Amino acid sequence: MNSPVTDVNALGADEVIVATGATANKIPVKGAETAIQAVDFLLGKQSVGEKVVIIGGGLTGCEIAYELYLQGKKPMIVEMMDDLIVTPGVCLANTSFLRDFFEANKVPVYLETGVTEIGEGTVTIKDKDGNLTTLEADNVILSVGYKPAPVAQKDKHIHVIGDANKVGNLRSVIWGAWDTCMKL
């Protein structure tokens, strides 16, 4: 144990459950390597300054913006879609609250907008009409989703579950694990 698994069949187990999670998506934008990954911020590995641009208006990005606002900071959300938190299955009360909160507290939300460059203290964004805007930012947080990171593929006795199989939320991964375990 405490070593990378390179061949799950070599473990000699009757059944193997792979629950290795997911890795953060990256964006092909100049300067993106200087941004903080959402998970690193959430785990307290990196702190942020006053003005923070959050790239990604999904549930995680919106919750980060909400928390930053409560800390007295100035979050700004940049989202490529035409609305925040478009993932199906997210609690409507939560999504409605966050949208209303951002509107009531004048948190800048840029919808249908992409990032063209992350610079020193700035983020350049481009809206659907091609207009460029430069935002001042002490920090940038990337919250652009995750992709499965399995160490093995499904097989008769290999069960890939949770985010290693399909990125979801806490409910979906727990229910999926329960379903798999009940079949063993």
Regions of interest found by a model, annotated:
Residues 1, 6, 20-71, 156-169:
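Glycine-rich dinucleotide-binding loop and its adjacent helix/turn
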Residues 15-17, 36, 53, 76-78, ...:
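Hydrophobic/aromatic beta-strand patches that form the interior of the parallel beta-sheet core
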Residues 1-11, 22-25, 111-122:
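A conserved short coil-to-beta-strand element within the FAD-binding core of flavoproteins
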Residues 67-113:
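Rossmann-like dinucleotide-binding cores of NAD(P)H-dependent redox enzymes
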